[in-house]
Structures are given as C-alpha cells and as structure tokens.
Design a protein with these regions (language model features):
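Sequence context of c-type cytochrome heme-c attachment sites
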Residues: 2-183, 189-254, 258-272, 382-384, ...
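Alpha-helical transmembrane segments
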Residues: 18-20, 500-515
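Soluble extramembrane regions of membrane proteins in the secretory/endomembrane system
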Residues: 71, 320, 324-462, 466-467
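Alpha-helical scaffold segments in carbohydrate-active enzymes
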Residues: 148-152, 189, 279-289, 462
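Feature representing long, continuous alpha-helical segments
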Residues: 230, 255-258, 278-281, 458-461, ...
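Repeat-solenoid scaffold signature
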Residues: 253-359, 364
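N-terminal membrane-entry
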Residues: 487-497
Length: 534
C-alpha cells in the first residue's frame, strides 16, 4: 500500500512538471489574446469627406482649408489651441523652480540647439501656418494646420523653411477630401525626423516603423498588429497622452505599457514582481536603432570649416554624415544597447538663461533613485556633444542658425559664430558679452519603442551577472542578486548552505546509527528467544 501511494504521488508530480514545461503562454494568456483582438479590428471611417461640397473647391491658401474644417468641426480648433502641439509648451511643476512653462519656446537641446530665432525652419514641425519669428499669433484659429495630422492621402508635406506652410506642390483640395484619423505617416512626418533627419534624435522612432516586421517592433509591424501611434497615445479633446522628456518635466499624462498590459502581464509571479522596480521597456527593448543609425554625439565646436570657401560634408560607409560645415561632427550607432537609469517620471530642464552649474551640463536631468518608491529602471539613449555658451554670463547661447541670404548673421550661411550669437540672443532677449566658447552637454532620451518579440527579451543573466558588461553594471546604490556582494548576506547564505549539508549528514548519520543499534537489538532479541527455546 505504501509503495502504491508513493508511485501515485510521483506520477502526479511528474505530470505537473511536464504540464508546466509544455504549456503555451500564448494559449493561456487570455488578456493578451483579448488585446490582440481589440487592435486587430481597425476603425473604418463612416464619413467620406470627398462628398462634402465645401471641400470640393480649389483652395487658395491652407488657411481656407482650416476655415472649411471648422465650419463643421466647430469647436475642435479650440481644443487644438490648448494643446502643447500648438503652444510648444506646457505648464508644469519643475522641481526647484515651481510652476513654470517649458517647451520648444524656451528649452535647449544638444541637436539643433533651439527653435527660438530659427522659427522659419523649425516651424516645419509646428501644427500651424506662418511661424516666421517669435511673434506668432497663437490666438488666430485660421493658422491651425488640420491637414498635417489628419491627411490620409500621404500627399501632404510641409515646405522646407516656409514657416510651417505646406509645400507648393501640395494639392490642398485633394488633401482636404482625404482626411481621417491620424496615422503613423502623420505622426512620423515630425517625430521620425527630429534633429534634422531620420532617426537622428530618438533612436527608436524612425521611418522604418512605417513598414517594419515584428523583429523591429511588435506593435507597429506591418506583419503584426500594425498599430498606429494613437492606439497608445490617445488624444481626448486633442490632449495627447505621452511625454517627451527633452521638453517635459512632470509625472502626469504619460502613456504607459500598463494601460494595456496591466501590472501583472506574466504567468510567472517572480517576473511580475520585477515590475515594482523595473520598467517593461528595460526588458522588452534590448536594442534600438535596429534599421537605420541614430546620432549619438554632435560637436558644434568643429563646425564652420570650409573647402575653397564653400561648406562641405563627409559621409561614412553607410551614407551618414559624420561631418558637415553647418553643424560640425557626429557619431552614429545602429543596433545600440541602451544605457539604464532610475526614473520617477519627473525631470529638471535647462531653460534659456539658466546659469551653467555643472560640467558636463545635463540638459534634461531625469530624477530617480532606488530608494524612491516611484522610480523604475528604464532604458535610455545618452546623447553627448558640445555647444556654444557665453563665457562671461556663463549661459548657453541660442544662436541664429537659419537664414535666407548672406549677411543676415545666420551661422548656416555666414559661418560667423559671434554674429550668429549676437543675433540669436537679441531675439530671445538675453545678454551676450561677445565672448564665447563651447561646453560639453548631455541629454537623456528614454527608449520606449522598437519593442522586441518576447523570445528576444533581455535574459535574466544579462543583468544578474558579475561580468563588467552586464546591462546594469553601471547602476549602483542597491543590491542586485547575482551581481553584488554583501558580506553579512553572503556569510549567512554560505552558513545556511553548509549548515544544511551538515544537517543532512548528521541526520543521515543518526539514521544509520539508529538503524545499526536497532539491528543489534533485534539480533539480541532473536538470540535470547533462541536460548529460551533450547
């Protein structure tokens, strides 16, 4: 009977182990299947704008198209005019500053430096018309560009350095008759090309996402869910969910993985517990810049060199500019492994006029630590470089870069830093001493896109390792099992290990001794009984 019970228990345990090994997560993960079903059904417009008489006309100006749009969508322009896409800033709390406006109107980055004094060119990525300088009328609804976000014909493009106006080749009537929900093409026309080219800034947002496979991004893959940006970055009343921490600073209105996948997306509770301190992105985005290179360094101090009096460029073997006279020298990377840092969703930004108080100067200091209950480990792209600053006032300079003709002090035409600095600082209302130099700058770009298939996620041993090339080797101030030494804990572990072995050996020895003693006793009893019988 005893043997039968042991056999049954063993068979049950074997069956449980075998079932656990063979089960398919895809089959049992009903939450994931439900999400796939929801996003597999693409919305179909119930409106054919080509049938609207008001749109069946030849439009003289893009503002006329806007007038036609708001004649039906009577209040939508008001929503747009309260958005950061329109105002290029948001009001938020910045630690150490209080409540303050921050955005493209007053931040500095270490790519093209800043939009101020360069609006004619930078407005190519503004959702409006006519931003030729810093006196743009943000109250004029006619200048709202509906088409840049809602064109579904893929024929609408902004002109180069035309203050946000569409290219002259655009057929406004055709575009107006083919509008709908924003697509990847709409969002990508700006966000894929920030910093002056494809994938320059982010590293995880680029034109390849318009037609990639699941190895590049499981969400946006053409052979996968083919999700649009607005599937995650929803826009209730034109208030877009999501933050870009080169211009944002507070932990509100963010787009997160958990809003769809919840805090417990895995079957394994140990993996789910990681979510308390580790972001989804840290494990599920092992690489970025998977298709095209991203810019990792930009040195303005080397700009301005000419050949025979003319600007020139130098390209690498992949066709990426590694030097241009107008911008300086660059470093690029593909299939880049992210760096990692603690982040609680808040940041401090360098704003125009701030004193330089550290070297290198961090332009967007992401806050967070292990001891902060809101912080998680996130993957980031670290972009480094240098840029012009005022040696006397000890502030970064906003130079005038773009111009239309020689002699208007634009660096990209005249290649004269003192004149470009003076003109730019005059326009933003800040002093310029006449003495300039270059200071090292750093920016952190959180990596949120290019999510890999689950079988390509970061492995346990890539973080929990004592190798110097471990993914979290540079993060300190906390105990990471498998990576760190802790003498009391290590001693306790070693003691318990050997104590366990010792306990097993002692227990075995006692069992053996008891068994021997028992046998001797039984033998003595048998001998005694035999003697009695004799």
């Amino acid at each position: 009977m005893k043997k039968a019970i042991l056999i049954i228990i063993g068979a049950v345990l074997f069956a449980l182990v075998l079932t656990n090994l063979l089960q398919s997560e895809d089959y049992y993960n009903l939450k994931l299947e439900k999400l796939k079903q929801e996003h597999a059904i693409k919305p179909i417009s119930s409106v054919d704008h080509s049938k609207f008489e008001i749109l069946q006309q030849e439009f003289d100006t893009p503002q006329d198209v806007t007038e036609a749009c708001i004649s039906c969508h009577t209040e939508r322009h008001r929503e747009v005019m309260h958005s950061s896409h329109w105002n290029w800033e948001r009001i938020s709390y910045i630690e150490g500053r209080g409540i303050e406006a921050s955005g493209k109107s007053n931040v500095i980055n270490n790519f093209c430096i800043g939009a101020q004094s360069n609006e004619q060119a930078c407005a190519k990525c503004h959702i409006g018309f006519g931003m030729s300088n810093n006196h743009f009328d943000f109250e004029n609804a006619r200048n709202v560009d509906c088409m840049v976000c809602h064109d579904n014909s893929e024929a609408y493009i902004k002109g180069a350095a035309t203050a946000g106006y569409p290219d002259r080749s655009v057929n406004l009537s055709q575009v107006a008759q083919h509008v709908g929900q924003p697509t990847k093409h709409n969002c990508g026309s700006c966000h894929f090309n920030g910093g002056g080219g494809n994938n320059v800034k982010h590293g995880d947002l680029e034109q390849a996402l318009l037609g990639c496979d699941r190895n590049v991004d499981v969400h946006m893959a053409s052979n996968g869910m083919d999700m649009s940006c607005t599937a995650c970055h929803t826009a209730e009343n034109h208030q877009m969910l999501g933050k870009l921490y080169s211009v944002s600073s507070d932990n509100t209105h963010r787009a997160t993985c958990e809003q769809c996948h919840t805090n417990t997306p895995h079957f394994d509770p140990i993996i789910n517990r990681h979510n308390a301190k580790v972001s989804c992105q840290a494990c599920h985005i092992p690489e970025y810049a998977k298709v095209n290179a991203t810019k990792m360094a930009w040195y303005w101090s080397e700009s301005g060199k000419l050949k025979d009096g003319e600007p020139y460029t130098v390209d690498d073997e992949m066709g990426n500019h590694i030097y241009t006279s107008i911008k300086g020298s660059f470093k690029w990377a593909t299939n880049a492994k992210p760096d990692y840092m603690w982040f609680n969703g808040t940041a401090n930004l360098y704003l125009l006029g701030d004193t330089i108080d550290e070297h290198p100067l961090i332009l967007n200091n992401l806050h967070g630590s292990h001891d902060d209950g809101e912080s998680k480990i996130i993957p980031v792209k670290i972009h480094v470089g240098d840029q012009i600053y005022d040696k006397v006032h000890n502030i970064l300079i906003q130079p005038k870069l773009h111009g239309t003709q020689k002699g208007d002090s634009a660096f990209w035409i005249d290649f004269d830093w003192p004149k470009a600095a003076e003109a730019g600082m005059k326009q933003v209302g800040l002093p310029y001493s006449g003495e300039y130099g270059f200071v090292e700058t750093v920016m952190y770009w959180p990596v949120n896109h290019m999510v890999a298939p689950k079988d390509q996620a970061v492995g346990c041993a890539e973080c929990h390792t004592r190798n110097n090339d471990g993914r979290l080797a540079q993060l300190s101030g906390f105990y990471l099992p498998g990576r760190d030494y802790n003498k009391p804990l290590d001693f306790a572990g070693i003691f318990l290990f050997f104590a366990s072995i010792g306990g097993v050996l002692i227990h075995a020895a006692i069992r053996i001794l008891v068994s021997i003693k028992k046998k001797r006793y039984e033998m003595n009893v048998i001998d005694y009984e035999n003697e009695q019988q004799i």
